[in-house]
Structures are given as C-alpha cells and as structure tokens.
Amino acid sequence: MSSAKKIGLFACTGVVAGNMMGSGIALLPANLASIGGIAIWGWIISIIGAMSLAYVYARLATKNPQQGGPIAYAGEISPAFGFQTGVLYYHANWIGNLAIGITAVSYLSTFFPVLNDPVPAGIACIAIVWVFTFVNMLGGTWVSRLTTIGLVLVLIPVVMTAIVGWHWFDAATYAANWNTADTTDGHAIIKSILLCLWAFVGVESAAVSTGMVKNPKRTVPLATMLGTGLAGIVYIAATQVLSGMYPSSVMAASGAPFAISASTILGNWAAPLVSAFTAFACLTSLGSWMMLVGQAGVRAANDGNFPKVYGEVDSNGIPKKGLLLAAVKMTALMILITLMNSAGGKASDLFGELTGIAVLLTMLPYFYSCVDLIRFEGVNIRNFVSLICSVLGCVFCFIALMGASSFELAGTFIVSLIILMFYARKMHERQSHSMDNHTASNAH
C-alpha cells in the first residue's frame, strides 16, 4: 500500500474504537444497576487493564507476530500452556455466543414481555442458537456481511445516551443509586469489574493490520490503547448517565435498557425501534461468531488439540459436525443455567452468569500473553512501557479473578486442570507413537 493511502494515528484510533464497541454493552446497564453508580471505579480499573492488554497485544503483533495470537503466545512459554489456551479460548467463545443470544432475546422482550423471565428466555435463546447453526451449515456467509450494519445500529442509542442523556440526569437519583449491592464499596467495585470487562473481551483482536498504518511500530500500540480508552469513556458515560436517569430498580428489571433511554430522549416511538435494531445487531453478530467458533474448532483439530471430528469439513469448507457439537454444548449450558435461575430472576441474570464464565476463561490466555511479552522483551529500562503494561495486565487478571463467585472460580480452575490432564494423555500418545516408529525403523 502506498504511503499516501496509509492511515495515521487519528484514523487508526477510530478504527480500533469501532472494532472494540459492539453488542457487549447492550445489556450491561441492567446488570450494573444491581451494583450501582459505584461501578464507575470498576470501569476505570477495567479501562486501565484493557488498555494495558491492548498495548501488550499490539506490541506482540508488531514485534513478534504469530499466527494464532494468544494461543501461539502461550505456546511460546510452554506447549502445555498453548494447548490449555487453545481449549479455554474455544470454550470462552461459544459461551460468549450464548450471552450475545440472551442480549438479543432481552431486547425482543420489548415486543414479547414473557421473554424477561429466565425459562422463556432460555428456550428462545436455544431456539436462536439452533436456527443460526443450520443457517451456517447451509453457508450463511451473508450473515457476517450484515454484522457491520448491525454494530452501527446498536451503537446509535448507546452514543446518543452517553452524549444527550445528561439533560435528564438527576444528581439525587444518582446518589440514591451509588451502591445498591448490599455490600461494602470495595467488594461492589471488584464485583463490577468482571461485568465491565465483558465489554472489552476481544481486545486481543482490536489492533488494526500493520500494513495499513503509517509508522506501525509507534502508531499501532498507541492507537490500540487510545481506541480502547475512547470506547471505555463512551461506556462509562452511557452507563453512568443511566444511573442518574432512572432508579436502579427500573434498570435492573429492564430487558432493554437503551430502549428505555431512547424513549425518554426521543419519545415512546423510539423504544421498539431501538429494540429491533439491537436484536438485529445481536443476531447477525451471533451468526458470524458461530461460524468463527466452528473454524476455531477446525484449527484446534488440525493442530491435534481437539478430536478429529471438529476438523471435518464438507466440500464447501463448512465444519458441520463442529457446528453441531458447539450447538449441543451451548444448549446443555443454557439448560443448566436456566434451571439454576428458574426459581426467580430475569433474563439479565442469565446474561450475568454467562459473561462471568466467558470472561474468566479468557483470563489465563491474557495472563500468558503478558508473561510472553516479558519473556520476549526482557526486564530492562529500555522496554519500560512494555514491562509496566505487562505487569498491569497480569495484576488486572488477578483482580478480575477476585471478582468471581466461588462457584465460577472453582469451575474455571477445575476446567483448566482437566485440560492439562488431556494434554498429558496427548503427550503420552505422541511419545508412544514416536517410540513405535523408532522401533520399526531400527528393525529395518
């Protein structure tokens, strides 16, 4: 690409912010309402952590580019960590897809109020998963083409609320909503971090291609941090203004928080329009992400990390069996979480459970990438910024883990250890195969 066509820092920052912002924010205000305006500190900590992680990945992309991103970086520390990261990453993605599905269902509750209840919401989400599984099996590449349109549509009410919503902001309402978590301020902040981080999951892929940027070694890391920070500021403004516009009980009970703010700002006609836009955005995003999960399974199978069935593709390159297996797992988890919440709660409770699990599963891959940058660049003054961002990224992973419930944390830890057991089995099979080949060659 000629130098004249390459983009500079300002444009690059805009691209990163656009890549970062999406449907992840759409249902967060309902979950954060149960914590309160104090979640602003959770946002600030999350932004610092996300910017640090963004720098780590941008630095690794420019200094040590590897096919496979976090999986490759973890593998540079230890092949066992690479295997573990590949499995964790795959499962985090399909679990995250369920959260996107629940967001779509929640915004559809504007038209079908029964979808605010966990059981109907769970059933609807499972139905959506299977519909898009079959769409992708038939070759639904057209779905991904609609994703960009959907993301623009979902961001309109978010940005509008962040900018215009302050006209309806009430300081007394905000003060009453400061800490609604029935716990100490410190615990409320830590609890909010796990939720806030959901909006930044995907930070590892936000960096733009170095080939389209002027002076990429300087511009890409800086733009990635600035773009992540810009997205975070929009998130803070949008969620904090809602804390001053409505009582926490209204937001917590809402299945479509930005539809409510749009109706206040523009009139009642806007709520169904925003709900339809957001549901459309989430559905197109889900369709696109489901195919990406299927392709991730193919890569893992080709690397020898997953059973061969995941790597089987048809004449069109579609991993039908992998898509079906992912849909079965998504259905099983959705049934389990729906049953756990069936005694009471809302669709947003399902969202909170799913995002918590998905975020926790990404913490080890993020941590390994930070450690790999320290390994690659060393501990010295010359690479001071890289060292600080790597350490901050590691600390942020620890803080996010602290915000998890004991059940979520224990589950993540157990799954991580079970993966290493499978790795040991894989190594045994590889060694046995190698010894058999060696014996056969000696016999000849």
Swiss-Prot record:
Changing residue 246 to L: Moderate decrease in both cadaverine excretion and cadaverine uptake. The chain crosses the membrane at residues 7-27, 35-55, 95-115, 123-143, 149-169, 193-213, 222-242, 273-293, 323-343, 354-374, 384-404, 405-425. NCBIfam families: 2A0302 (TIGR00905), PRK10435.1 (NF007754). It catalyses: cadaverine(in) + L-lysine(out) = cadaverine(out) + L-lysine(in); cadaverine(in) + H(+)(in) = cadaverine(out) + H(+)(out). Uptake of cadaverine at neutral pH is greatly inhibited by carbonyl cyanide m-chlorophenylhydrazone (CCCP), which dissipates the proton motive force, valinomycin, which dissipates the membrane potential, and nigericin, which dissipates the transmembrane pH gradient. Cadaverine uptake at neutral pH is also inhibited by putrescine and lysine. Cadaverine-lysine antiporter activity is not inhibited by CCCP. Changing residue 397 to S: Moderate decrease in both cadaverine excretion and cadaverine uptake. It holds the Pfam family AA_permease_2. It is found in: Cell inner membrane. Belongs to the amino acid-polyamine-organocation (APC) superfamily. Basic amino acid/polyamine antiporter (APA) (TC 2.A.3.2) family. GO terms for biological process: cadaverine transport; cellular stress response to acidic pH; L-lysine transmembrane transport. Induction: Part of the cadB-cadA operon, which is under the control of the Pcad promoter. Expression is regulated by CadC. Highly expressed at acidic pH in the presence of lysine. The global regulator Lrp also has a positive effect on the expression of the cadBA operon when cells are exposed to moderate acidic stress in the presence of lysine. Repressed by H-NS under non-inducing conditions. Repressed at pH 5.6 by OmpR. Changing residue 90 to L: Strong decrease in both cadaverine excretion and cadaverine uptake. Changing residue 12 to S: Does not affect cadaverine excretion and cadaverine uptake. One of its GO terms (cellular component) is plasma membrane. Keywords: Amino-acid transport, Antiport, Cell inner membrane, Cell membrane, Membrane, Symport, Transmembrane, Transmembrane helix, Transport. Changing residue 196 to S: Moderate decrease in both cadaverine excretion and cadaverine uptake. Changing residue 370 to S: Strong decrease in both cadaverine excretion and cadaverine uptake. It comes from the Bacteria. This is Cadaverine/lysine antiporter.
